[in-house]
Amino acid sequence: MGEKVVVLIGPTAVGKTKMSIQLAKRLNGEIINGDSMQVYKGLDIGTAKIRQEETEGIPHHLLDIKEPHESFSVAEFQTLARSLIKDITKRGKLPIIVGGTGLYIQSVIYDYQFSDAPSNDLYRQSLERCSPDELYEQLKQIDPLSAERIHPNNVRRVIRALEIYHCTGKTMTEWLKEQKRQLVYNVALIGLTMEREKLYARINQRVDQMIDQGLIEEVKRLYEQGLRDCQAIQAIGYKELYAYFDGMLTLKEAIEQLKQNSRRYAKRQFTWFRNQMPVQWFDMTDDTIFERRVNEILHYIEGKFHFQSNM
């Protein structure tokens, strides 16, 4: 088994950032971002990216490494995160991956080989003659989950997903799910959960806070730069307000849609994590026992790795 790695997962707004700082302080850890949208510069408020003053001196990696117009793939994330795990471990620190993008996190800790996906040159050439819109429409029909992750203009990735379906009869989502997977690290997989009613209330409250903190102005800056056909703008919080700036929605409708999409995303995250990985769950519904939960998680990690934290 490889290096020791803590993975902290959970749906949006469950409290991962606050918990990750406490764990990193007591475990001599460094944090690796595991959210596919926090890699983008300028997408700060809408992605709930940690602010410098909130880090409490804990090093954070894989934040702000891409311009909004650039694409970012799960294979690229895998390479960068694994390199960081090696580097952080070599310096005597503990890598802690924190985030909500399930496939990205899975790709790092399991032995995913993206190059093993089947291919068909003739079929690919026939797809390359189609327009991006035609390709994306095909993908939406056969694999809506992949269509949510892949921007319509990321033609290479859309074609890859269609190619896998053509060769195997399985969607890329199903194909990845069925790969025989082995953990490549000694992993402590921690999940934070919360009663749905409270989580949804927190999500709604967080959206209101984002608006107060300047989300509309943040999205307007991107909109005015002409950034439109790029992966970053598909993020929840950005696509809804783009519809407002395009005159398709009123501001009230855009904000309501943002809340609804965030709640749906949280539900999908829960489903993914519960079905895909052997997670040790900790319920964060009761705010008054936060410190007790920190200690319970530390105790679990100590048992898993056989070492003592700075509790």
From Swiss-Prot:
Keywords: ATP-binding, Magnesium, Nucleotide-binding, Transferase, tRNA processing. It is an enzyme of class 2 (transferase). The keyword Transferase applies. Its cofactor is Mg(2+). It catalyses: adenosine(37) in tRNA + dimethylallyl diphosphate = N(6)-dimethylallyladenosine(37) in tRNA + diphosphate. Residues 35-38 are annotated as: Interaction with substrate tRNA. It comes from the Bacteria. SUPFAM superfamilies: P-loop containing nucleoside triphosphate hydrolases (SSF52540). Substrate binds at T12, A13, V14, G15, K16, T17. Transmembrane segments: none annotated. InterPro entries: Dimethylallyltransferase, IPT, P-loop_NTPase. Its EC number is 2.5.1.75. GO terms for biological process: tRNA modification. ATP binds at G10, P11, T12, A13, V14, G15, K16, T17. Monomer. This is tRNA dimethylallyltransferase. The lineage of its organism: Bacteria, Bacillati, Bacillota, Bacilli, Bacillales.
